[in-house]
């Protein structure tokens, strides 16, 4: 997606290709839907081009970032940190690695919270409570070790 050049000029914006953007930016923040064309829009190649002082923020959709490549880039010091409100697979070892990385902040899909969203979540929360009350197994638990420890 690109705005009309007149609108970009009006907003004092300069369009640059993605590779140039990741090279120049101090902060890369993703705000696109997850489509075939946007899956892993940030991968090893883009991460390798980022400044070591730059941060990556993804509050849009898991799958936009190649989480394995992100973890490796962070471990190698290729970028300063990441803020993630979504990951590709909450139950993966890669996500655990990201969670254990000190320069990564992960939140549980709350970046887009609104009153309407809160109302829509009530049935899901009720189902989780019922599953727990019946001794069932929960899906998508990020910190399962605390659940198992009764904390």
Tell me the role of every PLM-derived stretch.
Residues 1-3, 121:
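Short acidic alpha-helix initiation/capping motifs at coil-to-helix transition points
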Residues 3-97:
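Rossmann-like adenosine-cofactor binding region
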Residues 53-151:
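Rossmann-like dinucleotide-binding domain for NAD(H)/NADP(H)
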